[in-house]
Amino acid sequence: MKQNRKNLPIILASSSPARIELLNRIKIIPSQIIPADIDETPNLRELPAPLAIRLAYEKAIKIASQIEESAIIIAANTVAAVGRRILPKATTYEEVKNCIKMLSGRRHRIYTGLCIIKKENDQLTVRQKIVQTIVKFKKLSDEEINFYCSLDEGIDKAGGCKISGYAEAFISFISGSYSNVMGLPLFETVNALTSLGFRCSSIMPAKMNYCHSAT
């Protein structure tokens, strides 16, 4: 009689509250959260999509090289861009303001590079995906821009805005995955996990029990 194998433990290579929340939405609770400390500086003339997938891979492979146990590592990197121009992860009030001014009344793209590595018996199996979402902000007044900047929610966010926060009120158009904008495209994440043999019955609508990865 064939026995069902236990899921490998999930390691999330990020301390992002949004990514943790998104995994919880699909009833997946990581066994460990290990942020990957890498240099996220774009290479010369590097475009947004290649940057996002490169950084996601570097995060995942770094954690895979650090652990000894078998596990599935989930890593992601989100990049906001207007055309080919990569917007920074804003770290100051002025950077947030500059980003919001640039996004006002324009379409921009959110790219999330997803890399999931299954490490088992020192063998690595890699799944990678780049997901793009198009977002358009309404034309913002100076008052709206200044108010948003005063909230500080755009600090440390790609493009200087938190789409799941107050900035959601600025969106006049969105095309593509909303969870991608938040930092982890759930459809692609579930597909990649499934292809690596990770089973979670709670992903199915009829099942509501949480699926903890094995410890």
Swiss-Prot record:
Catalytic activity of the protein: a ribonucleoside 5'-triphosphate + H2O = a ribonucleoside 5'-phosphate + diphosphate + H(+); a 2'-deoxyribonucleoside 5'-triphosphate + H2O = a 2'-deoxyribonucleoside 5'-phosphate + diphosphate + H(+)
Top EC category: hydrolase
Cofactor: a divalent metal cation
Gene Ontology MF terms: nucleoside triphosphate diphosphatase activity
Its EC number(s): 3.6.1.9
Keywords: Cytoplasm, Hydrolase, Nucleotide metabolism
Alphabetized InterPro entries for the sequence: ITPase-like_fam, Maf-like
Pfam families referenced in this protein's UniProt entry, alphabetically: Maf
Gene Ontology CC, one term: cytoplasm
Compartments it resides in: Cytoplasm
GO biological process per UniProt: nucleotide metabolic process
Chief location category: cytoplasm
Gene3D superfamilies documented for this protein: 3.90.950.10
NCBIfam families: maf
Family statement: Belongs to the Maf family.
HAMAP family: Maf
Function noted in UniProt: Nucleoside triphosphate pyrophosphatase. May have a dual role in cell division arrest and in preventing the incorporation of modified nucleotides into cellular nucleic acids.
Descriptive protein name: Nucleoside triphosphate pyrophosphatase
Annotated organism of origin: Rickettsia conorii (strain ATCC VR-613 / Malish 7)
Phylogenetic placement of the source organism: Bacteria, Pseudomonadati, Pseudomonadota, Alphaproteobacteria, Rickettsiales
